[in-house]
Amino acid sequence: MLVVALDTSTDMLACACAEWTATLDGGGVELLSHQDHMCRRHANVELVNAVDAALQDAGASMDKVGAVLVGRGPGSFTGVRIGISTAKGLARGAGVPLYGVSTLDASAWTAWRAGVRGLLGVAADAMRGEVYPALYSVDEDGPHRLFERERVVKAAVAVEEWSSRPDCDELQITGDGLVRYAKLFEEAGLMERVLDRELWWPSGEGLLLAAASSRVMLHDQSGDPAQVLPVYTRLSDAEENERKRLGLAQSAKSEVTGVADELAGRHLQFRPMGPADAEAAAELEATCFADASHTPWSPQQFMSELASDAAAPRSWWVAHDNGELVGIAGGMAIDTDVEILDVAVAPDRRRQGIARKLLSHVSYDVQMLGCTTASLEVEANNGTAIALYESLGFSRSGVRRGYYGTGADACIMTATLPLVLPVDATSPEPTAAASRPWPLPEPRRSDAERRLLEESSLVMAIESSCDETAVAIIDAAGRMLANQVSTQIDFHARFGGVVPEIASRKHVEVIVGVVDAALEEAAASLGLADPVAPGELAAVGVTQGPGLVGALVVGVAFAKGFAFAAGKPLIAVNHLEGHLYANLLTTPDLEPPFIFTLVSGGHTMLVHVRAWGDYEVLGETLDDAVGEAFDKVAKALGLGYPGGPIISRLAEDGDPKAIDFPRAMMHSHDYRFSLSGLKTAVVTYIEQEAAAGRTIHLPDLAASFEAAVFDVQFKKAWDALKQTGAKEYCLGGGVAANPHLRELLVRKLSRRGVRVTLPPQHACTDNAAMIAEVARRKYREGDYAGFDMDADPNMTL
């Protein structure tokens, strides 16, 4: 079987092709070609072309590949995601298995191939003064791990651990961590047996040898590309900081004076447990298990679970509503298994998906800490709980007699992580891929169905610029056959905004599942029984920018791998142009010239569209974007995230003239915007009312804030229409979904003889339908991108 191996977790782009032959002990590897080379910060530009070159050197092509192998890290966060996203795209586009292997193991096998034998230490660079340390015993059969799982430590700690070993004089060291921390190792006398510098990085052959030895291609992994995830050794900085903050918190409730009462009960929210939750958690436990054999936990037990010096890592989450704790779940990570310690949901809040959401968050945390399996005990007669766990992928593996007391047995259940959690807009949980046979069978098509697909010229588009993973499929006539979105709001809400690190992780986890859902939906729209296959598409479009760079690279890398493997052209799409084209979903006959206002979380701009592709940006915001201002005001009020929809709902019952907030730059005689002054005015008002002991009437504040923003938007738009002579006006961006802004613009501009086009509300926030419309037109014009395309976070119109 022909296998392509790749890794970009370090500055080395490792890429190789080999013939793999199954054997009883794992497999034999015959290296055919390699394209290993240093590519610092250019992996996303060079990787697909390196795969192409390696295949050509091997006298093969992608349609001959039987499997793809990828390094899962640990390593550079961005590098690992580029490699895994590209590999997922290659495997899904070609319909072949994808397998993952530790980059540390690949480095050890690279040393073995060079003749290294004995005690070997790999110190991979983890940045921030840290390394990923790994010790191996290397003999003629290969490297053997002397550690349970990957971890991250300060470089000085690794040096101390290794230099204090009684056999340290036998230790040979390698790894790209030596580039940054050589002095530390040298001062400890560990550089005397350092390997040659060219061996400090993993090679393509090392990946192949590591995979063969670990039997990953002999049923140790399913081969489903949706299931392959990076090796993470720590939570994101935002998550770590949040845990520290909660550890110091005195109360889990909102302390915003004057608004707490009005906020109570507006949202069911999920967040990590803090010490302030211990009493309520114990009370909830006692209520939930009042009639069970299980002994409820005490507040002291919960406090000990949250201690920073706990012997094993913990993850505890709570669900709260109306200032009341309504659910808890927690687990303890031991080696690569998480033991689920407790799950409890208030009796009147059951069957609402709360337990599933809580377990999804616990599962996600421990996956980031290296866990690959989960286990738990549940009362054998608790059929409801057992059914829930079975739906998540747990299976019964044993019984503990009398575990909860005489005659009260415990059913032992185990599961492989990630849990079976559906990927959809209402359940944005980690890696929603259910276990399934892979590769998928070839679709069965009649001649008429094949003609239909060929005539339809289906274009698939991928959007990943921020916190939505979206995929849409459009036909040649502009009919939207599929439109799938997986949102991450639950994972960012507790931080009051999008955390780029988490957004990037989530895209990697769900992108295959969202693509699968779109291919199935498109088939159903065409009346086909089997999902659309990658080879039945005409082209693949993807958002190139602007956006969060870590989020963009996932979509771009996946799309490039997918298009290359499927043999389809690649189309680069400007996200801002996508928001403009979203108006065509409502008004297909829309033609320039017209004025376009973009109002989103990242952009506020006024554009004169002279022709398709010919855009004059008349003015932009000098500081905060409109959506950003909404989020910041909502955060100041303790309303939660995202702020736009919450403020909009409050404003429905408010008086827009109740508070006279400033209209910044309304009479500046240009098309620039500024929102920071308005934001400051709102915060000042909140502080003044709090100091006076007055309760803030949130609907009035929300309506007055909206009016201050929207009055300026209308004034600038009308001035631009008069200056340019345009008779049509369009709106776009997440804030374009606001019903009050839509009504105001239609009412005021229509009476002035302007035709107003608004995108469908579902197409205002980030989605792939608008990207698909741009990609369809570019496909028709033959406007394709090369496989050296990279994400452009600063792209402009």
Question: Where are the regions a protein language model picked out?
Answer:
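Conserved N-terminal entry element of GNAT/NAT acetyltransferase domains
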Residues: 259-276, 411, 415-431, 435
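A short helix-loop
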Residues: 183-188, 218-223, 445-465, 472, ...
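Surface "functional belts" at beta-alpha junctions
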Residues: 25-26, 30-32, 36, 42, ...
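Conserved GNAT acetyl-CoA-binding A-motif
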Residues: 366-377, 400
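Conserved beta-strand-loop-alpha-helix junction that forms the acyl-donor binding cleft
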Residues: 376-385, 402-407
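A contiguous, well-structured pocket-lining segment that forms one wall/lid of small-molecule binding clefts
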Residues: 246, 251-260, 531, 649-729, ...
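N-terminal beta-alpha supersecondary unit
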Residues: 1-74, 298-299, 456-536, 542-546, ...
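Acetyl-CoA-dependent GNAT
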Residues: 272-276, 282-348, 359-369, 416-418
